[in-house]
Amino acid sequence: MKQIILTGDRPTGNLHVGHYVGSLAERVKLQNSGKYDEIYIMIADAQALTDNAEHPERVRQNIMKVALDYLAVGIDPEKTNIFIQSMVPQLTELTFYYMNLVTVSRVQRNPTVKAEIQMRNFEASIPVGFFCYPISQAADITAFNATAVPVGEDQEPMLEQCREIVHKFNTVYGETLTMPQIVLPSNNACMRLPGTDGKAKMSKSLGNCIYLADPEEVVREKIMSMYTDPDHIRVQDPGKLEGNTVFTYLDAFCQPEHFAEFLPDYQNLDELKAHYQRGGLGDVKVKKFLNNVMQSLLSPMRERRAQWEGRLPEVYEILKKGSEIAAETAQGTLDRVRHAMKIDYFTDIGLLK
């Protein structure tokens, strides 16, 4: 069996460092591992429209931004097929067929759907398209016969629902769809990176994101204003690590070699944490170290982004070609689904019997 990856993002704004540690870094690693026969990354514009239906221009203007983010982090269009969801109409038809295999109550029990509905204040009036997006995601995944789906922890219930749909379809209609497996970040700190203000999740509306496209000075300003331990008022005071956003980011991004380069007084992160906890280490020093760590990560991304920004027609062609390849693959899955459901009426004369 071919090993295939499908993953993607909603184009509702620039991607941030939470996206990077949550899934983008893993995608680049998997892409370069040589273990996968095909890799598809989807810019999920149709899904973004489920809560932006009255403002499609917001989605449109972010297509190229997200594509540039992908290329900046190291996604290679020679190894990975980047495509736009709405340019693959087969996904919509697959979604329609899968809807018959899922109950309303099952979607309502999905923890991710519950959280998203609450976050968007949809409790009183939920758009049908938004409510059904777990089913749409199942269509996205199965259309490309994905065996692996690298996502953040918050998307785990969505993949579980997809697996239920695959099982149900194969039980009712015969073995047709590929059962996908979830690929989660190995570092617990990467599962869900908090915002710079210590809030549970990065959000554009809360203004607590460090974007992959942020200039160097903007990143520095955001890090220096980060939430730490509110009781760590004086340098000599013992500091707490729990809920301290700066140390959460260090857990996610810091590598052993960063100490030799930026903070040679310490051998590793454990030593730094121990000093902070017993007192005598100020927040400013730790934040400056984190800034150096983050800049070393983001600087190569800025360089790659600048190169691609000067070649936007090429980026356009990458998306166009990628969408054409994706549509061809999805059509093959749709043909098999129709055949399994016995609704491929005009492929033979069986309808006349």
Q: What do these predicted ranges mean?
A:
Residues M1-Q3, F346-T347:
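Extreme N-terminus of proteins, especially the signal/transit-peptide cleavage junction
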Residues P11, V149-P150, N208:
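A generic structural motif
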